[in-house]
A protein has these predicted regions:
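Conserved metal-binding segment of the jelly-roll/cupin
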Residues: 101-122
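Non-catalytic, conserved peripheral segments adjacent to functional cores
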Residues: 1-104, 123-128, 132-188
């Protein structure tokens, strides 16, 4: 992405970047440049994925110790929650939460050690590039609604009971404190 193709905004979390891609459209449709290597010189993306979600889905909170992510919203709207657990992992502080609402053409770069999840506010297509191929041993997660973490998720009006739609895996995730204990006691 060149300076003409994207705009970036700062984050409170070290290494996290937010931005918006330029959409070039005419009567035929639209074109968007999703990624350019020189815009992320320290990241070597090796796999691209496409996730689709119906409104009301929460995915996360997921954590990788060996993978950076670049998310691009293809279509729809997402409430994105990022939780920097690097200070907690190092034993030097507590997790820090940052949230943003991202629309089509918005992107976020998520470095290793920053947990991430989203709520599909409306039907959502999320494209994500990652710096490592899928590795199940690096698929960590903690409860999206962990009260100690306190992500300020928006109220849901898209499901009858106001609860999000989650996967069985995400619904079974432990608390962040339990995950940190497991990580600290696991061999590298």
């Amino acid at each position: 992405m060149s300076a003409a193709d994207t705009t970036a905004t700062p984050s409170a979390l070290p290494g996290v970047q937010f931005g918006t891609i330029a959409r070039h459209g005419d009567t035929r449709g639209a074109f968007r440049e999703l990624w350019r290597a020189r815009s992320f010189p320290d990241a070597t993306f090796v796999q691209a994925n496409l996730s689709t979600s119906v409104a009301g889905v929460v995915r996360g909170l997921h954590l990788h110790r060996r993978q950076d992510d670049l998310w691009v919203v293809g279509e729809g709207r997402a409430f994105v929650a990022l939780v920097d657990v690097r200070p907690a992992l190092a034993g030097t502080g507590v997790a820090v939460v940052e949230t943003r609402e991202l629309d089509a053409d918005d992107w976020v770069y998520i470095p290793t050690g920053v947990a991430h999840g989203f709520l599909a506010v409306e039907p959502l297509q999320l494209i994500y590039l990652v710096t490592n191929e899928y590795d199940g041993s690096d698929e960590l997660g903690f409860a999206w609604d962990d009260p100690v973490v306190g992500v300020p998720w928006p109220t849901l009006a898209v499901t009858p009971d106001g609860r999000p739609i989650t996967s069985d895996r995400d619904a079974a995730n432990p608390s962040l404190s339990d995950l940190l204990v497991r990580i600290r006691h696991a061999p590298d």
